[in-house]
Amino acid sequence: MSHNDTIVAQATPPGRGGVGILRVSGQQARNVAQAVLGKLPKARYADYLPFKDADGTALDQGIALWFPGPNSFTGEDVLELQGHGGPVILDLLLKRILTLPGVRIARPGEFSERAFLNDKLDLAQAEAIADLIDASSEQAARSALNSLQGAFSARVNHLVEALTHLRIFVEAAIDFPDEEIDFLSDGKIEAQLNEVIGDLDAVRAEARQGSLLREGMKVVIAGRPNAGKSSLLNALAGREAAIVTDIAGTTRDVLREHIHIDGMPLHIIDTAGLREASDEVERIGIERAWQEIEQADRVLFMVDGTTTDATDPAQIWPDFIARLPAKLPITVVRNKADVTGEQPGISEVNGHSLIRLSARTNEGVDVLRNHLKQSMGFDTSMEGGFLARRRHLQALEDAANHLQQGKAQLLGAWAGELLAEELRLAQQALSEITGEFTSDDLLGRIFSSFCIGK
């Protein structure tokens, strides 16, 4: 589809509501205004007008806003029609606009894509629009807004500028070897490189926090039947999300709850008790439990404290531990402290965290919440942060690796060309974040995940 087309879409959610908004962007937006409104509204003023059909009859009446390009969200001529939010009314108005020449329905994210292509937003800011809409906590929303306002991009652009400055010195030393310009003898290049590496590490740490706010952590509760897994899910969720009975195998399928701990999203997953299945339904539930375990960020190994005194997971259930992915973090949760008389709390056993609690009485559950927050390295004291996506983290990691390779060249045999190339690759990786260096395929994947009308 051409970016020269004029596009239209509903900007408000589908369904019944008090207000419904249609957004038009492109060269034909002026003609749409003339056809539907009978005139072109004054730029950037709210005008209360009837919205007319082709025969001149009114379809609706509401507020029209006219934003001539390039001073608009997309950088093109933009018309917004704010009418009543009934789906029939909006559908009639949308059909009316689509009868006009050169107008088509917008693809998901196409308004934001045009804003990016017309330099109204960089790619990180455009992604922040979707993240702001999808934010699941106040802290995530604030961080997404910071990204939309350019906080993340400013940090990245500062790094890119520093690398540009560094590359000038390095490439000058390569291009003019006879000019007696020795940038290495006084250690200035090494000092500048170390400064860039330090700044990049700080951005990476903040980006990891932003990624936690956006992606959250997937925690799977696993163990034998009747260990209290569903009771723990209910305790963490603060509601009766799962059925709890004394009957082994009550939970047959995967149950999911999304909670927040100090703004950090947690995806808590309760699974079927692991044992030899008694029927086909239970077998499928246990198979799904293992699928969730293999994709988890952390496993809470639930143990009924009344059945064993062991605290080492390898002693409690060797076969279970042997089947777990090698690098998967495990937290042993000894449940039913209210029955065993154990003191709720946390300790370390053979490299694993051990938490004693009672899911039934909630004793020790706060200890588990704090443990989950700390295990992900989430720092609530970081103010004014930004949200980051997986691709951002990968780009930052790639840049860091190239800088370390460049430093090795600098401190080793002084292979100037190789150092310059590593600096160029680091700069290219950072530029992918803001979209200065980005493939069309990546752009398509990013914007296709947006809402229609955004």
UniProtKB/Swiss-Prot annotation:
GO biological process, one term: tRNA wobble uridine modification
Gene Ontology CC: one annotated term: cytosol
Coiled coil: none
Positions contributing to Mg(2+) binding: S230, T251
HAMAP family associated with the record: GTPase_MnmE (MF_00379)
Family to which this protein belongs: Belongs to the TRAFAC class TrmE-Era-EngA-EngB-Septin-like GTPase superfamily. TrmE GTPase family.
NCBIfam families on file: mnmE_trmE_thdF, PRK05291.1-3, small_GTP
Stated name of the protein: tRNA modification GTPase MnmE
Gene name tied to this protein: mnmE
